[in-house]
Structure formats: structure tokens, C-alpha cells
């Protein structure tokens, strides 16, 4: 299968292997499926997630790059912008167009110029600075705002658990 999506994903994977980017690594879940990647995100320095190794699956649609991939953490992670099932909720992973809920500008949403690298750097940035205005995990957002010590304890447990799994 030599679709535009396949060729683009093969190129991005090759580029990441040749020129690794600080903060994450990526590879295929199964060598026969270019549309499903396994990524490891290293907790960013000077954040609550520092020292953690968080695993996620990045799934690309057949019409990539016209539609965004989905990213789902398979490691436990406590964060306002990660749904309880692990799905990442950031603007650039939302389909192009206007936001029906009015939280995001069209310019903040997915565009075909985004790459695996830009997505991963956005997720690392999300770990560094949670957005509690439109949370995916309401309980985590509430703790982030009102009970920061509890939030820190839960994140510390996730970091420790990720280190044990590494």
C-alpha cells in the first residue's frame, strides 16, 4: 500500500530514527502496520512528571495528514488534559474547522502541516503546563486548581509506577 499517508508516515519515522528528538522516542507497534505507532514520552525536566517514562499509542487515520491521529497513553497518567481512558485532549489533535463548544480557534486545531514531532512536542508541553479551562479529566483539573498537594501525590505515584515498568 503506497498511499500518501503511508509514504508520509514512513518518511516521518525514518527522519525520527535518523534525527531523534529530546523528550520522546517512537517506533511501530507492528512492522506491518505504519498506521499504529508506539511512543515513549520522557517526563519533562522541572515538571511534576520529571523522571517518568510514559507509553502511548498513536493511531493514524487512512486519510492522514488531512485528519489528525489519536494519542492514548497506555501508562497510568494523572493530568487534566488526559481522559481517564488515556486519550490525550489537546487542540492540535482535534479535527480541523470551528470548535462547536467555542473553546478553540480554528487556527489552534489540526492542520496537515503537523508532524509526529510537532504532536509529541505539544504533548510534552501539555505535561509541562496543564490547561484546566477545558479539561478531559475534570477530577484532575479540580485537584490541579484546588488541592495541588493531592495532585502532586497522584502524579508522583504515576511517575514511580512508570519507572518500575521501564
Curated annotation (Swiss-Prot):
Catalytic activity: S-ubiquitinyl-[E1 ubiquitin-activating enzyme]-L-cysteine + [E2 ubiquitin-conjugating enzyme]-L-cysteine = [E1 ubiquitin-activating enzyme]-L-cysteine + S-ubiquitinyl-[E2 ubiquitin-conjugating enzyme]-L-cysteine
SMART domains: UBCc
Residue ranges the record marks as coiled coil: none
Active site feature: 89
Chain ranges of the UBC core domain: 4-164
Keywords of the record: ATP-binding, Nucleotide-binding, Transferase, Ubl conjugation pathway
Protein task: Accepts the ubiquitin from the E1 complex and catalyzes its covalent attachment to other proteins. Involved in the formation of multiubiquitin chains. Signal the protein for selective degradation.
Record protein name field: Ubiquitin-conjugating enzyme E2 13
Organism, as annotated: Arabidopsis thaliana (Mouse-ear cress)
Taxonomy of the source species: Eukaryota, Viridiplantae, Streptophyta, Embryophyta, Tracheophyta
